[in-house]
Amino acid sequence: FYPRMRDQGHGHIVNTASISGLVPTSLMAAYSASKHAVVAFSETLRAEAESDGIHVSVICPGIIDTPMAHTTELRGGGSEGVLGKLPSPPFPVEEAVKQILAGVAKRRGIIVIPKEANALWRAYRKSPEAMLRINQKTVGWLRKLTGADET
């Protein structure tokens, strides 16, 4: 599809990552690493594709109310009980779609939704060390809540 977009002089590639691709996520190291790779790929392709008239966006959603949000397992333990203890409920799919499409229409490179995920990303960019300490405390809470192990 890239050659066709290049030949026509325009196009828009949209990749899906996660807020975990921008902010390290406790007890989800492999998932977080894979999503960081999607973000890096997208940002690199964005720089390369611009001269061909091709835009690239990467979607980095927080917890969206999809089956995945209700079935994701943390390393060494389940997810049961985690969603109900989060500061805010999973974001509605319909609203997520609206915000994603608005970001694509504005040709944003990185689209972070909902606002809570965006706040988390801003906090991480401002102070990675402070977020590391918060993440370290979150590990204990998640392990206790889910029975996740330390490996």
Q: Language-model segments: which ranges?
A:
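Active-site-adjacent segment of SDR/Rossmann-fold oxidoreductases
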Residues: 4-5, 23, 44-54
